[in-house]
Swiss-Prot record:
InterPro entries per record: 6-PGluconate_DH-like_C_sf, 6PGD_dom2, Mannitol_1_phos_5_DH, Mannitol_DH, Mannitol_DH_C, Mannitol_DH_CS, Mannitol_DH_N, NAD(P)-bd_dom_sf
Catalysed transformations (reactions): D-mannitol 1-phosphate + NAD(+) = beta-D-fructose 6-phosphate + NADH + H(+)
EC number: 1.1.1.17
Disulfide pairings: none
Protein family membership: Belongs to the mannitol dehydrogenase family.
Record's keyword terms, sorted: Acetylation, NAD, Oxidoreductase
The organism of origin for this protein: Escherichia coli (strain ATCC 8739 / DSM 1576 / NBRC 3972 / NCIMB 8545 / WDCM 00012 / Crooks)
An annotated GO cellular component: cytosol
Record-given protein name: Mannitol-1-phosphate 5-dehydrogenase
Residues modified as N6-acetyllysine: 269
Length: 382
C-alpha cells in the first residue's frame, strides 16, 4: 500500500506519518520546508521520542519526501492508495488545487483503484471541508469520476505534540505523548476498509468528536483557568492541586453524563477515559503553560465550545453541573497581557457586569438560573 501525507511537521511525523510507516505502508511526505524535505530524502528515517511515565525512542524508517508545490506531488496522487493531511485547518484550501490536479491525472491514466483521502486536523469534519475545496478546483468533467472513485473520509484526532525539548538541532526529531487516538468514519471509504494499527473505524464519528470536546478540551480549559487563578504555571502543577483536580474531574464526569445519555457510551469505559486524560495532564514531559491553554476565553465561552456546550447538555437532560459552573466562572476571571480576547472579556465585564457579559458571550439567557449560578461562583472567586 502506498500513502502520501501532506505536512511533515511535528504532528505529521510524530503521529499520522508514524502510524502509517509503522503499518508497513510505503510513505511519502509532502511539505514546503526544504530543510525537512532534504533531511528526509538523505536519511529516509527519523526519531520519535514517545513520552509518558517513561521515555522511549522509536525510529521511523523507509520514508521519503516531495515538495507539496511541484509536479511530483501531482504524479503521486495519481498512483497512491491513501492521502492524509496534517497541515492545519487554514492550509487545507491551499493544497486542494494540487490534489485536484492529481485526481485529473489519475482519471486520465485510467487508474480506477479506490483512493481515500483523510484530513487529520483539529476541526470537525475537516475532510468534508477539504472535499469542497477540491471539488471547486476540479473541471466539471472530472467531478462525477471523483465522486465514484475517491473517498473523502472524516476523522477525529487526538495526540499532544509539545514543543520539542530535544537538545539536538535535528530538524526531524520529534516528541509526542504516549496517548494517541485516530478515529475515522468508516461509512465514507471507497473499496476495502484499511487495517492500520492505531486507526479506529466508527460509523458514529460525531460521538467521538463530542467525547474529545467534552472531556479533553473541557478538562484542559478548566485546569488552565483554575490553575492560573491559583498561581500555578503549568497544567501539570494545576492538576496536582487537589482542589483543582476535584473540580476538573467533577466537570468531566458531568459532561460525561451528557455523552452517556446522548450516545450510549459505556459508563465504566468513559470513567477510564477520564482517568486517562487526568494522567495526560500530569505528564511531566509536557510543559504546557496554563496561560497558553487558557487563551481565547471568548471563543471557549461561546455556545458551541467546550464549556457552554456540555452545560447545555446538562440542562437538556436535567443533570447536575456545579463543577462546569466553576469552570465557566474561572474562565470569566482569565486575564492575560498577551491575549486580546482576555482583554476584551475584562472590558466587557467591567462595562456590562458579569451577568450581561456572560449572556452576551455564551448565548445563555441573562435571567436563567445557570447564569445566576455562574455569576455567584464568579463573585465568590474574587
Amino acid at each position: 500500500m502506498k500513502a502520501l501525507h501532506f505536512g511533515a511537521g511535528n504532528i505529521g511525523r510524530g503521529f499520522i506519518g508514524k502510524l502509517l510507516a509503522d503499518a508497513g505502508i510505503q510513505l511519502t511526505f509532502a511539505d514546503v520546508n526544504q530543510v525537512v524535505l532534504d533531511a528526509l530524502n538523505a536519511r529516509h528515517s527519523y526519531q520519535v521520542h514517545v513520552v509518558g511515565e517513561t521515555e522511549q525512542v522509536d525510529t521511523v524508517s523507509g520514508v521519503d519526501a516531495v515538495s507539496s508545490i511541484g509536479d511530483d506531488v501531482v504524479d503521486l496522487i495519481a498512483q497512491v492508495d491513501l492521502v492524509t493531511t496534517a497541515v492545519g485547518p487554514v492550509v487545507l484550501e491551499r493544497i486542494a488545487p494540487a490534489i485536484a490536479k492529481g485526481l485529473v491525472k489519475r482519471k486520465e491514466q485510467g487508474n480506477e483503484s479506490p483512493l481515500n483521502i483523510i484530513a487529520c486536523e483539529n476541526m470537525v469534519r475537516g475532510t468534508t471541508q477539504l472535499k469542497g475545496h477540491v471539488m471547486n478546483a476540479l473541471p466539471e468533467d472530472a467531478k462525477a469520476w471523483v465522486e465514484e472513485h475517491v473517498g473523502f473520509v472524516d476523522s477525529a484526532v487526538d495526540r499532544i505534540v509539545p514543543p520539542s525539548a530535544s537538545a539536538t538541532n535535528d530538524p526531524l526529531e520529534v516528541t509526542v505523548e504516549t496517548f494517541s487516538e485516530w478515529i475515522v468514519d468508516k461509512t465514507q471509504f471507497k473499496g476495502a476498509l484499511p487495517n492500520i494499527p492505531g486507526m479506529e473505524l466508527t460509523d458514529n464519528l460525531m460521538a467521538f468528536v463530542e467525547r474529545k470536546l467534552f472531556t479533553l478540551n473541557t478538562g484542559h480549559a478548566i485546569t488552565a483557568y483554575l490553575g492560573k487563578l491559583a498561581g500555578h504555571q503549568t497544567i501539570r502543577d494545576a492538576i496536582l492541586d487537589e482542589k483543582i483536580r476535584a473540580v476538573v474531574k467533577g466537570a468531566m464526569e458531568e459532561s460525561g453524563a451528557v455523552l452517556i445519555k446522548r450516545y450510549g457510551f459505556d459508563a465504566d469505559k468513559h470513567a477510564a477515559y477520564i482517568q486517562k486524560i487526568l494522567g495526560r495532564f500530569e505528564n511531566p514531559y509536557l510543559k504546557d503553560d496554563v496561560e497558553r491553554v487558557g487563551r481565547q476565553p471568548l471563543r471557549k465561552l461561546s455556545a458551541g465550545d467546550r464549556l457552554i456546550k456540555p452545560l447545555l447538555g446538562t440542562l437538556e437532560y436535567s443533570l447536575p453541573h456545579k463543577n462546569l459552573i466553576q469552570g465557566i466562572a474561572g474562565a470569566m476571571h482569565f486575564r492575560s497581557e498577551d491575549d486580546p480576547q482576555a482583554q476584551e472579556l475584562a472590558a466587557l465585564i467591567a462595562d456590562k457586569g458579569p451577568q450581561a457579559a456572560l449572556a452576551q458571550i455564551s448565548g445563555l439567557d441573562a435571567n436563567s438560573e445557570v447564569v445566576s449560578e455562574a455569576v455567584t461562583a464568579y463573585k465568590a472567586m474574587q
